[in-house]
């Protein structure tokens, strides 16, 4: 069992009955140490939760909790991890051992702590001192609100709400208007200097690479069948199944391949994404399909198939292609391409928020950045236009999502890259607006947060 899954599934506590002597709302700090990583934990008895401090916070209720006098133990029936400890009334602390899924015991002690001293527990430990124009770095111009037509009142209200934790686990907010960065703020112990996992925002980067490959004549347009670009072992076995599928079907999520990435949470074996860990997920997936062109079905394997097409069509590894054709021309140096699978395919990568902004600003400028045409302008328009409706006011292009917002009594179009947990690049061409957000909303609804932030604050802030 994956250690992180087992750990995060355990990290929540029911209230300790009988502790009675503790002052109201005390917090306990502990560190769970593995050879390769240290997990900082905060126990909040009043809220009955154990928080993981850092970039992946979570809390999940326990199935079992026992207390016999000062002996404390908790576990979860469907996991093989648990904790046993002893509460010491004199020190007001808890000492014990965490037993993980391979039966290894690890000492874990909790001591009383002021959470305000623990960075990462709250959105901001040191209060904001007021608005400041972001620093000029790496070719991204910066301007004050007054020079780009932004209402400072709405921005200040939004930042206050982020400071108060009204939008949980939003770690970054960057706003660019009329080609200049005007807002750059970070929360929950993140400062923007490190690369952040962008999850399925990676798909929109692959869309850009596809447009470049089409312009170079390496692949055809949307009607090009994928069969001729698949690895040889698939051409023989699944040619009759894959033959009708085109690049259009791949990038618009209409392949007809049976896949359910929505009904069950990620990590649940019933979620089709679990197939991605199989020895040969493509072969398993192609065994069941409907005719391509069927209604939209979000499918991360489509992204992997597109990577395969590009690798075979360009003659470049996916790593070489994305680095030489996209990241380097954008001046992006601090990145992580993540783990490649045994087929050499890139899943999701990590970028700094500012570098995500560069990508969004390039698309706003029809594929041009710093005087260089990186992505064909025609492809920017093609890939970000709606190809298939998803639900009310939500559509999908070629690895880009589409929506509209209300602005001054009319609707303005928006396309956006969207990754699990709250990773976003929003582009609103009519307002010359680009917004980047990163988050760790693994168990909440980041779509609701992001839409509220955009519709209630950032879009109407544009004068």
Residue locations for each model-derived region?
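Active-site helix/loop module of the DD-peptidase/beta-lactamase fold
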Residues: 216-257, 287, 314-351
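Structured C-terminal helix/loop/strand segments within mature extracytoplasmic catalytic/sensor domains
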Residues: 417-463
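N-terminal leader/targeting segments and the immediately adjacent pre-domain N-terminus
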Residues: 16-71, 78-190, 216-220, 252, ...
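Active-site SXXK
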Residues: 179, 197-222, 250, 306-310, ...
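Bacterial Sec-dependent N-terminal signal peptides
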Residues: 1-24
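Active-site Gly/Thr loop motif
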Residues: 333-334, 381-434
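Active-site-proximal alpha-helical segments within enzyme catalytic domains
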Residues: 302-309, 347-368, 423-440
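Catalytic-site signature segments of enzymes, centered on catalytic residues
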Residues: 192-195, 262-347
């Amino acid at each position: 069992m994956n250690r992180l899954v087992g750990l995060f599934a355990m990290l929540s506590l029911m209230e300790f009955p009988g502790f009675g002597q503790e002052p109201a709302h005390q917090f306990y700090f502990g560190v769970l140490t593995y050879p390769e990583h240290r997990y900082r934990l905060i126990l909040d008895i009043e809220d009955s939760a154990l928080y993981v401090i850092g970039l992946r916070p979570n809390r999940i209720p326990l199935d079992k909790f026992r207390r016999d006098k000062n002996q404390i133990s908790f576990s979860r029936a469907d996991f093989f991890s648990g904790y046993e400890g002893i509460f010491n009334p004199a020190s007001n602390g808890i000492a014990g051992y965490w037993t993980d899924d391979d039966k290894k015991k690890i000492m874990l002690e909790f001591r009383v702590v002021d959470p305000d001293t623990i960075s990462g527990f709250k959105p901001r430990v040191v209060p904001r001192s007021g608005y400041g124009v972001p620093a000029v770095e790496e070719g991204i111009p910066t301007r004050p609100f007054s020079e780009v037509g932004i209402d400072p009142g709405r921005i200040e209200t939004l930042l206050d709400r982020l400071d108060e934790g009204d939008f949980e686990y939003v770690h970054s907010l960057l706003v660019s208007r009329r080609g200049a960065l005007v807002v750059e703020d970070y929360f929950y112990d993140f400062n923007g200097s490190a690369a952040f996992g962008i999850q399925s925002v990676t798909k929109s980067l692959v869309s850009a690479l596809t447009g470049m490959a089409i312009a170079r004549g390496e692949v055809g347009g949307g009607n090009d069948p994928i069969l001729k670009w698949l690895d040889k072992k698939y051409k023989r076995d699944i040619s009759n199944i894959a033959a009708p599928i085109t690049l259009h079907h791949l990038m618009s999520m209409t392949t007809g391949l049976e896949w359910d990435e929505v009904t069950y949470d990620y990590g649940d074996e019933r979620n089709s994404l679990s197939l991605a860990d199989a020895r040969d997920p493509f072969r398993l997936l192609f065994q069941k399909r409907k005719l391509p062109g069927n209604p939209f079905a979000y499918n991360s394997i489509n992204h992997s198939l597109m990577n395969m097409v590009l690798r075979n069509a360009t003659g470049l590894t996916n790593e070489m292609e994305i680095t030489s054709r996209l990241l380097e021309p954008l001046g992006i140096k601090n990145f992580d391409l993540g783990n490649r699978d045994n087929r050499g395919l890139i899943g999701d990568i990590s970028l700094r928020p500012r570098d995500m902004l560069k990508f969004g600003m390039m698309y706003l400028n029809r594929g041009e950045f710093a005087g260089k045409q990186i992505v064909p302008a025609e492809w920017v328009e093609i890939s970000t236009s709606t190809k298939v409706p998803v639900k009310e006011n939500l559509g999908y292009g070629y690895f880009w999502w589409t929506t509209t917002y209300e602005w001054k009594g009319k609707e303005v179009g928006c396309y956006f890259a969207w990754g699990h947990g709250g990773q976003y690049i929003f582009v609103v061409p009519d307002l010359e607006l680009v917004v980047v957000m990163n988050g760790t909303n693994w168990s909440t609804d980041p779509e609701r947060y992001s839409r509220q932030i955009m519709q209630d604050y950032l879009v109407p802030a544009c004068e």
